[in-house]
Regions:
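Solvent-exposed, flexible loop/coil residues
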Residues: 94-96, 121
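Conserved donor-binding/catalytic loop of nucleotide-activated donor transferases
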Residues: 74-76, 96-102
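Nucleotide-sugar donor-binding catalytic core of glycosyltransferases
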Residues: 1-87, 91, 106-111, 117, ...
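Conserved acidic donor-binding segment of nucleotide-sugar-dependent glycosyltransferases
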Residues: 122-129
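A charged, aromatic-enriched C-terminal amphipathic alpha-helix characteristic of glycosyltransferases
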Residues: 129-166
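Short, loop-centered acidic/histidine patches that primarily coordinate divalent metals
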Residues: 95, 109, 128
């Protein structure tokens, strides 16, 4: 299980819970929590209760390069996606995982409404009390219809835009 992203809102607290859960299941994980600088860490520690138990070493202060991110995704079977609590749509990480054909664990309960959703590929986790069944990790990735992969690709998106405009 891998997570790469900016440490905002309740992400740090949720990552800590998921880390303990994954460790108890004997699974490998890689979490890269990014903050723009160490001053922001102290601001969050003061203002955000989710950061109260955080330490400077829990975060990275240099963004992961795109080629490093791609390497993390390539080496991972499952990616953790934690949307901002006020976000209702899909994250870019979700779209990336469709293209990468990777399993996704997400806090976005609306994802069930999308045509690419399949329970073997996507598990919705409760951000307050995360539970991820062992079976989800053991299931193979289920290939979805090629039309769906195309729809969420850059080419598919451009076709949709230009077809609508013409």
């Amino acid at each position: 299980l891998a997570f790469v992203g900016t440490a905002h809102s309740d992400r740090f607290a949720l990552i800590q819970k998921v880390y303990k859960l994954i460790q108890s299941q004997g699974l490998k994980c890689y979490f890269y929590l990014y903050l723009q600088n160490w001053k922001l860490f102290f601001w969050h520690k003061f203002k955000n209760p989710a950061f109260r138990k955080a330490h400077l070493k829990d975060f990275h202060y240099k963004a992961l390069a795109k080629n490093e991110l791609f390497e993390v995704i390539k080496k991972s079977r499952t990616i953790l996606d934690i949307q901002h609590p006020k976000q209702s749509g899909l994250t870019i990480r979700t779209i990336e995982m469709i293209g990468a054909r990777r399993k996704l664990i997400t806090t976005n309960s609306n994802i069930k409404e999308y045509d690419f959703y399949h329970p073997a590929n996507i598990f919705i986790v409760d951000r307050e009390c995360p539970v991820i069944p062992d079976d989800f990790f053991k299931m193979d990735y289920h290939q979805v219809n090629s039309d769906i992969y195309y729809k969420y690709s850059l080419d598919g998106w451009l076709d949709e835009i230009f077809t609508t405009l013409l």
